[in-house]
Amino acid sequence: KAFYHDFLEWLGYKQIVGGKDFAGWGNGEAEIFVTYLERYKDSGFHRRRVGLNHMAFQAKSRADVDRLYSEFLVPRNIKVLYGGPKEYPEYRKGYYAVYFEDPDRIKLEFVD
């Protein structure tokens, strides 16, 4: 929960609801809810199983992608994937993103 609180607040989301085992954040355009039950913690997450592969968040600019990397990910020692922010021309022209993992190894993407 602490990771998503810090990450989503950094992106400009505000916490709109919270309880013992859940929390939700919104930014006026989207809402994100996270649940965390201790009894399921040991089963782990793998993005290749059926279900969620990763979550992507839209950046306003390439500079915002770089800023997330340098101001949020690196100082917190968050695991960054694929060498950091870069272009992915195989997706589309100008696709610029940074991929990283949350503490449960869920892959996240911040893309311009």
Protein language model features and the residues they cover:
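Core segments of cupin and vicinal oxygen chelate
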Residues: 1-33
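Alpha-helical elements of the RecA-like P-loop NTPase motor core of helicases
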Residues: 2, 66, 108
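Conserved catalytic-core motifs of GNAT/GCN5-like acyltransferases
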Residues: 14-18, 88, 111-112
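Residue-level marker for the onset of beta-strands and adjacent loop->beta junctions
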Residues: 19-21, 53, 96
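Long, continuous compositionally biased terminal/linker segments
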Residues: 27-69
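Vicinal oxygen chelate
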Residues: 56-103
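Short, contiguous alpha-helical
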Residues: 100-112
